[in-house]
Amino acid sequence: KINPSVSPGMEAIINKSLVYNPGERFLSAAAMKEVLIALQRGQAVAVQPATPAISGGSVTSILPGQIAPPVGATSTLSIQSAPTGQETGLLTSTYFGITPLWVFRCEDEIRSQPLPVGKFVYVSVYDNNLYALSRADGKFAWKYASEGGFAASPVHEGGNVYIGSEDGKLYALTGETGRPLWSYQTGESVRCTARVAQGHIFVGSDDRFLHAISMHGGKRAWTYETPAPIRSRPYVLDKEARVFFGCEAGEFFCLDFGGNMKWRHRSKRAITSSPNFVDGLVIFGSADYNVYALEASSGWTVWKQRTGKPVVSSPAVSEKAAYIGSADGNLYALDLRSGKILWKFETGDQIASSPAIYKNAIYFGSVDGFVYCIEMKDGKLRWKFKTEGAVISSPTVVDDVVYIGSTDHNLYALTA
């Protein structure tokens, strides 16, 4: 039943906090509190889209008793309508005058990392589909529908694509046509991106197990049980025959290729971040606000660096530094040997996107709706591109093109 005592101003605030697109909600609890206090005092309430339009948003003031406009009504950005799952009209950002090479619009949010291989770019979407698009112009090639959305990103090996789904399955498809080869059922959603090595696929599931699966036929080789869901993508060292990954209970594991634990490390909170490896170090982030560097052979902590909020972003590494985002809105450059902060770059909101390094630049997205390109040496901004939603997707940069998705339902191809 409708509660007549709820004012239009309160209704507008509640609607904004519950809107489907995270980028259109309040930027923080503090921002929502400020508006609620103003409403209580009978002041004008400013409800502003959390991600202003490319050509500039405006603030809508709602006085007590007034009716709020629909969320996003102040946006002046127009995206050409296109048939579902086809390329849209090109958008030009007023920030640095950037025009995408092409844009492909899907039916739901894109939170995964696009995978350009050969003539295709593959992207998994919450509309339950894995898409294959032309890298040249973004034209639709094929799509494969699962029974659940895709939070995991696709991987490609031997001409085939492998991807986990919310329906609990890992799918193997032909890369050329999307024809299904086999599927492997786990006990819960698969939000972990798989890793292919030594003829096997290593993938975590919300059923708390790491699964080792044969590439040929999808038969189980072994499983390893952990205390919590696994969403951290495994890192595999072929020569040492080691598999590294974290779980949501805050534990980080090193297994051999037979599924036997060699060592484990405990952090204080969940490890969603996927590890990277460089010079004998395994580096990853944790929800306990820290970035860790562990000795790969023993699990001994070489260093840890605290950020301002949880770290779900995964690190990119160079010869001298590790680069990783934090929910405090900063991208950090950390010295590989000491963990010392070399520099940090501040964005307008949380960073869940994992950075990519390409030609002395770093590319990543932020919940503030921007795709950023910054200098690797000092963190200076080169350019930024505005989307109409939070950018949780991680970029892939190949042949001078940045492929990245947004919660605005679009996949963007940008010139690097």
State what each model feature region is.
Residues Q66-P69, L77-R111, L115-R191, R195-A416:
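Extracytoplasmic/lumenal domain signature
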Residues N15, Y20, L36-I37, A44-V47, ...:
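Short amphipathic alpha-helical "recognition" segments used for binding
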Residues K1-V45:
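C-terminal lobe helix-coil module of Hanks-type protein kinase domains
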Residues L18, G57-S58, L255, L414:
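Short, surface-exposed, charge-dense and proline/glycine-enriched linear segments
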Residues L27-L77:
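Juxtacatalytic C-terminal regulatory tail of Ser/Thr protein kinases
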